[in-house]
Curated annotation (Swiss-Prot):
Compartment(s) of residence: Plastid, Chloroplast
Species assigned in the record: Populus trichocarpa
Name of this protein: Small ribosomal subunit protein uS2c
Family statement: Belongs to the universal ribosomal protein uS2 family.
GO molecular function, one term: structural constituent of ribosome
Gene name for this UniProt entry: rps2
């Protein structure tokens, strides 16, 4: 895999607070190699290592995107939801940003049925079929459609398991991570100082609580994905 330059600089990461970890009492000792200092009871992440692993992750997703691989971005907590949706839409990736439904990947046949139901209801809505139903039935289907849009809207075009899953908060998305591990799907995780780097394939040490930090990391990754997709288009 060829190493590329992704314009990752320490000043930008400092300005967005990527280096701020959790309170020292909440740390995971496995994160010791990624921590450079303690400041006012908070662990400080080693940004040199963050830059290195982020660059490696960008190389990986570029290479995967250039081979038409499919990505799923997961981040369901409030601070991650909007950056995840924006990043995924920009890079034409699938995403989950509201709630991880148990078995979403490991019980894919059930997820496929839900997605088909979602597509059918969307078509009914577009063609006006729902509005021609009795008022009670129409209201029930509209509620069902709203529920499916909320939780499956980001994966409505997904036709199979993703090739790579990008996870914003390892602890918050532990169920998603476990499903990826079970299925052998490679993962890229933002890991804060309270996380376990051994659980993911590529760990990016970073503040997973600050919107600016999340946005910066995701922007670098989706830029690499977009570049990879462009590379495929230029060299099919």
């Amino acid at each position: 895999m060829i190493r590329r330059y992704w314009n990752i600089n320490l000043k930008e990461m400092l300005e967005t607070g990527v280096h701020f970890g959790h309170a020292t009492r909440k740390w995971n000792p496995k994160m010791a190699p990624y921590i450079s200092a303690k400041r006012k009871g908070i662990h400080i992440t080693n940004l040199t290592r963050t830059a290195r692993f982020l660059s490696e992750a960008c190389d990986l997703v570029f290479d995967a995107a250039s081979r038409r691989k499919q990505f799923l971005i997961v981040g369901t907590k409030n601070k991650a939801a909007d950056p995840v949706a924006r990043a995924a839409i920009r890079a034409r990736c699938h995403y989950v940003n509201k709630k991880w439904l148990g078995g979403l990947l490991t019980n894919w046949s059930t997820t496929e049925m839900r997605l088909q139901k979602f597509r059918d209801l969307r078509m009914e809505q577009k063609t006006g079929g729902i509005h021609r139903l009795p008022k009670g039935d129409a209201a029930r289907l509209k509620r069902q459609l709203f529920h499916l849009q909320t939780y499956l809207g980001g994966i409505k075009y997904m036709t199979g398991l993703p090739d790579i899953v990008i996870i914003v908060d390892q602890q918050e998305e532990y169920m998603a991570l476990q499903e990826c591990i079970t299925l052998g799907i490679p993962t890229i995780c933002l890991i804060d100082t309270n996380c376990d780097p051994d659980l993911t394939d590529i760990s990016i040490p970073a503040n997973d609580d600050a919107i600016a930090s999340i946005r910066l990391i995701l922007n670098k990754l989706v830029f690499a994905i977009c570049e990879g997709r462009s590379s495929y288009i230029r060299n099919p």
